[in-house]
């Protein structure tokens, strides 16, 4: 669903920010 896709994108963004 759209909600799940949004959660996945948020998780990827958070991980990317931590790795930066």
From Swiss-Prot:
Q: Where in the cell is it found?
A: Secreted; Nematocyst; Target cell membrane
Q: For the region Plays an important role in the hemolytic activity, what residue ranges are annotated?
A: 3-12
For molecular function, the Gene Ontology terms on record are:
toxin activity
> Which family is annotated?
Belongs to the actinoporin family. Sea anemone subfamily.
Subunit details: Octamer or nonamer in membranes. Monomer in the soluble state.
The major lineage groups are:
Eukaryota, Metazoa, Cnidaria, Anthozoa, Hexacorallia
Example of a GO biological process term: killing of cells of another organism
The GO cellular component terms are: extracellular region; membrane; nematocyst; other organism cell membrane
Segments forming a coiled coil: none
UniProt keyword annotations, A-Z:
Cytolysis, Ion transport, Membrane, Nematocyst, Secreted, Target cell membrane, Target membrane, Toxin, Transmembrane, Transport
From the Swiss-Prot or TrEMBL record, give the protein name. Answer: Equinatoxin-1
* Physiological role: Pore-forming protein that forms cations-selective hydrophilic pores of around 1 nm and causes cardiac stimulation and cytolysis. Pore formation is a multi-step process that involves specific recognition of membrane sphingomyelin (but neither cholesterol nor phosphatidylcholine) using aromatic rich region and adjacent phosphocholine (POC) binding site, firm binding to the membrane (mainly driven by hydrophobic interactions) accompanied by the transfer of the N-terminal region to the lipid-water interface and finally pore formation after oligomerization of monomers.
Annotated region N-terminal region: the residues are 11-20
Q: Which organism is it from?
A: Actinia equina (Beadlet anemone)
Q: Quote the record's domain comment.
A: Composed of a long N-terminal alpha-helix and a core region rich in beta-sheet structures. Before the pore formation, the alpha-helix binds the lipid membrane, partitions into the lipid-water interface and stabilizes the monomeric molecule on the membrane. Finally, it traverses the bilayer, thus forming the transmembrane pore.
From which domain of life does this come?
Answer: Eukaryota
């Amino acid at each position: 669903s759209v909600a799940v896709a949004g959660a996945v994108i948020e998780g990827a963004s958070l991980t990317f920010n931590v790795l930066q």
